[in-house]
C-alpha cells in the first residue's frame, strides 16, 4: 500500500531579479513501512524535496499525499524529522529533550517519563535520562535525537544526512540501530544522503536524482538478499559491490 505519494512536484526559488527552478515534475510513491533513500549530485533538490514532504513550505506546483490525504497542518504530526545536527536543548536533561515534542503537542504528561525511559532503553542509552547533552558523545546525542523523534509516534521519518557528522565507527553503529528500530516500530522512512554505500546498506529502494533542475532520474531496487541483512553486514556481502558500481556509474553519467 502506498503511504506517501508525490504528484507533479515543481519548485522554484524567487528573488527580485530571477527565478531558479530546483525541482521539476517529481512523481513517486513510497509504500507503508518502506525505507528508501534519495541520492544525487549537489543541486538536485533532495533536501528541498524533503522539506516539502515535511510540510515546512509548499511546492510551487504539485501535491503531496500522506496516508491518502494532502499534507496539511492537521496531519503533519504523522511526520518525524531527524537532521545532521541533533538540536538538543543544552539546558534541558536528556529525558526532557526526548519528551519535548509530547509537551508541545500537549500529550498526557503522566506518561512522559515512562515514554522517555522506554525509548532511551530502545536506543541503547538506558541510564542517561538525567544527563545533559554536553555529557554525551556525538553518536549518543544522535541516538537521543532518534528517541525524541520516535516519542511522538510519527508514521514516517525523514532523515536528512543524520550520520554525516559522525566518525565512521559511530556512523556504522547508528545505521544498524536506526534500521533495526524503524523495522521494529514499522515506520516508513526516507534518508537523504550523499553516501551511496549508506543508501544501499539501509534501503529497500534508492531514488537517484539529477540536478539543475532536480528531476527523478532512476530508481534502483535493492536485492532482497541485502534487504534481509543489517547495514554493517550488507557491506560484506558480495552483491553489495555490484550494486554500488551500478549506482555509481549511473551517478557519474549525470556529469
Predicted regions and their residues:
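Conserved signature/switch motifs of ABC ATPase nucleotide-binding domains
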Residues: 131-134, 152
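Conserved ABC transporter NBD signature motif
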Residues: 62-74
Amino acid at each position: 500500500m502506498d503511504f506517501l505519494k508525490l504528484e507533479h512536484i515543481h519548485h522554484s526559488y524567487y528573488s527580485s531579479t530571477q527565478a531558479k527552478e530546483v525541482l521539476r515534475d517529481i512523481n513517486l510513491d513510497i509504500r507503508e513501512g518502506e525505507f528508501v533513500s534519495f541520492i544525487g549530485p549537489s543541486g538536485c533538490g533532495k533536501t528541498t524535496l524533503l522539506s516539502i514532504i515535511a510540510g515546512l513550505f509548499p511546492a510551487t506546483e504539485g501535491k503531496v499525499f500522506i496516508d491518502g490525504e494532502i499534507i496539511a497542518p492537521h496531519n503533519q504530526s504523522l511526520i518525524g524529522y531527524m537532521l545532521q545536527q541533533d538540536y538538543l536543548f543544552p539546558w534541558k536533561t536528556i529525558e526532557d529533550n526526548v519528551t519535548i515534542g509530547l509537551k508541545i503537542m500537549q500529550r498526557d504528561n503522566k506518561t512522559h517519563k515512562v515514554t522517555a525511559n522506554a525509548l532511551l532503553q530502545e536506543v541503547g542509552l538506558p541510564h542517561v535520562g538525567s544527563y545533559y547533552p554536553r555529557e554525551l558523545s556525538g553518536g549518543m546525542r544522535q541516538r537521543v535525537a532518534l528517541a525524541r523523534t520516535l516519542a511522538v509516534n510519527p508514521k514516517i521519518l525523514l532523515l536528512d544526512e543524520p550520520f554525516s557528522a559522525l566518525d565512521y565507527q559511530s556512523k556504522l553503529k547508528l545505521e544498524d540501530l536506526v534500521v533495526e528500530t524503524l523495522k521494529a516500530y514499522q515506520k516508513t522512512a526516507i534518508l537523504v544522503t550523499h553516501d551511496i554505500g549508506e543508501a544501499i546498506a539501509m534501503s529497500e529502494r534508492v531514488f537517484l536524482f539529477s540536478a539543475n533542475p532536480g528531476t527523478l532520474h532512476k530508481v534502483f531496487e535493492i536485492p532482497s538478499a541485502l534487504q534481509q541483512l543489517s547495514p554493517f553486514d550488507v557491506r560484506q556481502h558480495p552483491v553489495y559491490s555490484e550494486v554500488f558500481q551500478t549506482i555509481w556509474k549511473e551517478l557519474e553519467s549525470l556529469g
